């Protein structure tokens, strides 16, 4: 195979609309082979600590992720090598013993809140996208999602947001905006910005031979 894969990084705060942007890219390039890698399956394996201790971990901090493994996997995919991607158990806050074999694709989309925090990972990306959404909107989306999909109470979501999510966003996520090639305000609803982004991806795909 002569073409090199193109790696697109999509980041932004929790509830910013990263998933909507990622879906828009996938829909646009449905004729190409696409692989989506979520950063949050690369949380550290915590099988060696108790469930109670796992609950105390700050999952919005860069140290919560096994970034070295993620970097090695993205580098392997760029060389057209398969990887053994972790499978994360969100109910138990640790990895499953099983892994998922992933083959390289033409377009690799890496999505996550802290994918631009490490320069080694940034250097593996062809396009870096930051989805920039108002803090209040992001909070409301997270509140509704966690109450509906994860059975959380309103008080617990608010407490976590104020004590962990918001401070970590301001300290680690928001500052990575300066590394983005493209900033998309208001996420998946910004069709003009998404069209510009997909045009850029098409241009790079044509050159990657």
From Swiss-Prot:
It comes from the Bacteria. Its main location: cytoplasm. Coiled coil: none annotated. Its EC number is 2.7.1.48. It is found in: Cytoplasm. ATP binds at residues 12-19. Transmembrane segments: none annotated. Keywords: ATP-binding, Cytoplasm, Kinase, Nucleotide-binding, Transferase. One of its GO terms (molecular function) is cytidine kinase activity. One of its GO terms (cellular component) is cytoplasm. Belongs to the uridine kinase family. PANTHER family: URIDINE KINASE. This is Uridine kinase. It comes from Listeria monocytogenes serovar 1/2a (strain ATCC BAA-679 / EGD-e). The gene is udk.
């Amino acid at each position: 195979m002569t073409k090199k894969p193109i790696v697109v990084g999509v980041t932004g705060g929790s509830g910013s609309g990263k998933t909507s942007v990622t879906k828009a890219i996938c829909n646009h390039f449905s004729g190409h082979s696409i692989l989506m890698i979520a950063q949050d399956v690369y949380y550290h394996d915590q099988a060696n600590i108790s469930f109670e201790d796992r609950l105390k971990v700050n999952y919005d901090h860069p140290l919560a992720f096994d970034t070295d493994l993620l970097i090695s996997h993205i580098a392997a995919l760029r060389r057209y090598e398969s990887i053994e991607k972790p499978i994360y158990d969100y109910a138990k806050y640790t990895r499953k013993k099983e892994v998922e074999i992933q083959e390289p694709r033409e377009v690799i989309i890496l999505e996550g809140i802290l994918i631009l925090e490490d320069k080694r990972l940034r250097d593996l990306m062809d396009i870096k996208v930051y989805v920039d959404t108002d803090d209040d909107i992001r909070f409301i989306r997270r509140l509704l999602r966690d109450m509906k999909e994860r059975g959380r109470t309103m008080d617990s979501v608010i407490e976590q947001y104020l004590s962990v999510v918001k401070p970590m966003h301001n300290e680690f996520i928001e500052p990575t905006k300066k590394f983005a090639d493209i900033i998309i305000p208001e996420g998946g609803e910004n069709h003009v910005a998404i069209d510009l982004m997909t045009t850029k991806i098409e241009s790079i795909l044509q050159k990657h031979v």
